[in-house]
Amino acid sequence: MTVLIIGMGNIGKKLVELGNFEKIYAYDRISKDIPGVVRLGEFQVPSDVSTVVECASPEAVKEYSLQILKSPVNYIIISTSAFADEVFRERFFSELKNSPARVFFPSGAIGGLDVLSSIKDFVETVRIETIKPPKSLGLDLKGKTVVFEGSVEEASKLFPRNINVASTIGLIVGFEKVKVTIVADPAMDHNIHIVRISSAIGNYEFKIENIPSPENPKTSMLTVYSILRALRNLESKIVFG
């Protein structure tokens, strides 16, 4: 597999380290050269690339996606908070209808998306509570505090780098059905996501406590491995979930 990785932060570097690729291209505006990686000076999708992996930012998703959709590639997107922008979301999916590309949204920092996608037509509401250390939200607080309650769209304006989980859920069931609570807790040294699903099929609750990456406490290693799983599934004859 020949890949183009957008973003050479902690996630991108881990993919290079742990992935099994024939050739790796990378596009990153600030990263230094990495051994074994062909760094692109300007953004493009080389003709030999079969898969594009975005692990940079919601801004990168908005800036490069429409160009990527012109190529016959598998496009894996992790910064799904870009889709909280309704204007961009509508344009993206409009372009995708006639695109030769296929788009994949990994589960990222949570689980249970197989359940959610299976019953999406019957879902009434999804409530997601995210508990984070205040510093990861750019806050300095002394006690546990609810810092936000509301819609995914509203949350994305205040915490654009912390809404990927909620945005992925919104892409599955519809953003209007998702309610977000963000809690800052100084006692926490990791992130917790609690997802509560109410549906005509059943009610479900998932609690995910992620251990931060040693290199970047803001990143969950589960996110890295969910991307690696998505990459493996592209070539595997057996797929679970």
From Swiss-Prot:
<dbReference type="InterPro" id="IPR002811">
    <property type="entry name" value="Asp_DH"/>
</dbReference>
<dbReference type="Pfam" id="PF01958">
    <property type="entry name" value="Asp_DH_C"/>
</dbReference>
<feature type="binding site">
    <location>
        <position position="109"/>
    </location>
    <ligand>
        <name>NAD(+)</name>
    </ligand>
</feature>
<dbReference type="InterPro" id="IPR022487">
    <property type="entry name" value="Asp_DH_arc"/>
</dbReference>
<comment type="similarity">
    <text>Belongs to the L-aspartate dehydrogenase family.</text>
</comment>
<dbReference type="Pfam" id="PF03447">
    <property type="entry name" value="NAD_binding_3"/>
</dbReference>
<dbReference type="GO" id="GO:0033735">
    <property type="term" value="F:aspartate dehydrogenase activity"/>
</dbReference>
<dbReference type="GO" id="GO:0050661">
    <property type="term" value="F:NADP binding"/>
</dbReference>
<comment type="function">
    <text>Specifically catalyzes the NAD or NADP-dependent dehydrogenation of L-aspartate to iminoaspartate.</text>
</comment>
<dbReference type="InterPro" id="IPR011182">
    <property type="entry name" value="L-Asp_DH"/>
</dbReference>
<comment type="pathway">
    <text>Cofactor biosynthesis; NAD(+) biosynthesis; iminoaspartate from L-aspartate (dehydrogenase route): step 1/1.</text>
</comment>
<dbReference type="InterPro" id="IPR005106">
    <property type="entry name" value="Asp/hSer_DH_NAD-bd"/>
</dbReference>
<dbReference type="InterPro" id="IPR036291">
    <property type="entry name" value="NAD(P)-bd_dom_sf"/>
</dbReference>
<dbReference type="GO" id="GO:0016639">
    <property type="term" value="F:oxidoreductase activity, acting on the CH-NH2 group of donors, NAD or NADP as acceptor"/>
</dbReference>
<keyword id="KW-0560">Oxidoreductase</keyword>
<feature type="active site">
    <location>
        <position position="193"/>
    </location>
</feature>
<keyword id="KW-0520">NAD</keyword>
<feature type="binding site">
    <location>
        <position position="164"/>
    </location>
    <ligand>
        <name>NAD(+)</name>
    </ligand>
</feature>
<protein>
    <recommendedName>
        <fullName>L-aspartate dehydrogenase</fullName>
        <ecNumber>1.4.1.21</ecNumber>
    </recommendedName>
</protein>
<keyword id="KW-0662">Pyridine nucleotide biosynthesis</keyword>
<dbReference type="GO" id="GO:0051287">
    <property type="term" value="F:NAD binding"/>
</dbReference>
<dbReference type="GO" id="GO:0009435">
    <property type="term" value="P:NAD biosynthetic process"/>
</dbReference>
<keyword id="KW-0521">NADP</keyword>
<dbReference type="InterPro" id="IPR020626">
    <property type="entry name" value="Asp_DH_prok"/>
</dbReference>
